[in-house]
Every structure is written in C-alpha cells, then in structure tokens.
Amino acid sequence: RLMCKRFGADMVYTEFVSADALIRSVNKTMAKLNIDEQERPVAIQIYGKDVPTMVEAAKIVEEAKPDILDINFGCPVKRVAGKGAGAGMLQNIPLMLENPCGSRCR
C-alpha cells in the first residue's frame, strides 16, 4: 500500500478480510488491519456470509480506524461466493440488505 501511495495512488485498500477470521482473531488476518499513517486514506474491505458475523467483524475493523469500511459483494471466486459471501451474497438480496454494514452506512 505504501508503494502505491508513493507512486501516486490517492487511496489504497487492504486485501479483503474474512469476517470469520476476524472473529477468530487469526494472526495473519489481524495483521492486515495494521495501518501506517502514510497510507491514508485507506479502506479495509471485509467479506462474510451472515449478518451477525459481519457486524461483529465491522466492530473489530473500526478499532483499526480505517478511513473507509467496505463490504465485498463482488468476489466471484468459488471458495468465497460458493459459501454465500462476496458475489454469493447477491444470491440472497434480502440478507444483503439486512446487513447494516453494507446497505445502510453509505
């Protein structure tokens, strides 16, 4: 992210982060939340398949104080979408709209 900023990026994103991994405090996942002040503005993008987990993950992400919290509704990778997350969430619009992190906080 720092390299992107040095070469002129106005904003950078983290890799997308699994809401389930955030809830379990997986070290590799938690490390993605580390933000260097030189990276700002920076967005942290999360993905998940159910609302309670996404809300809990969003609370964890907020502690990292990103400039933007983004919800991934577009990843088509089978490992993600096949479990109902990312683009898989688009198969269940009522559930997607129930997600306060993605549908009401714009």
Cite the ranges covered by each PLM segment.
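Flavin-dependent oxidoreductase catalytic cores
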Residues: 1-106
